[in-house]
């Protein structure tokens, strides 16, 4: 039966099941034959990773042409001002491509208080302030969010995917390294597709 799994991927875990010499992989966290990641999450990024055993669902969740949004919380160097936020929202040229318009906002300290400590902790320079921003995109090019924040002068220190395809990590209450199975009707993008197919 087609299914979807939501995992809170910890920092340092490689987004594959096959063994790797240098990093732990998804196999160290879950044993789910026939399930594969719907999209990827860099080894040094954390947060929501969706996995499925259904090829069409995998495509619908991960491929930009279907418009599935992904939301990230990025801890960046410096005090991000209005100009940088507007540039990210409009889209920036990164050399090989120009990003589509994004939704972007500064996060308050009270919002990020829900986050878990990263292991190992990030390297913070005492003389340089940092802050958190939220970015929602629908593309997902290689290291896109990190490249975007660096382009506007704010290198990324920590990156967490908090939502994808209508699934919110905080709603699931998953601690790092834990996972849960989702029903199709809990994944809004797939539920909408199923409704269209039955009409």
Residue ranges of predicted features:
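RNA pseudouridine synthases
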Residues: 1-199
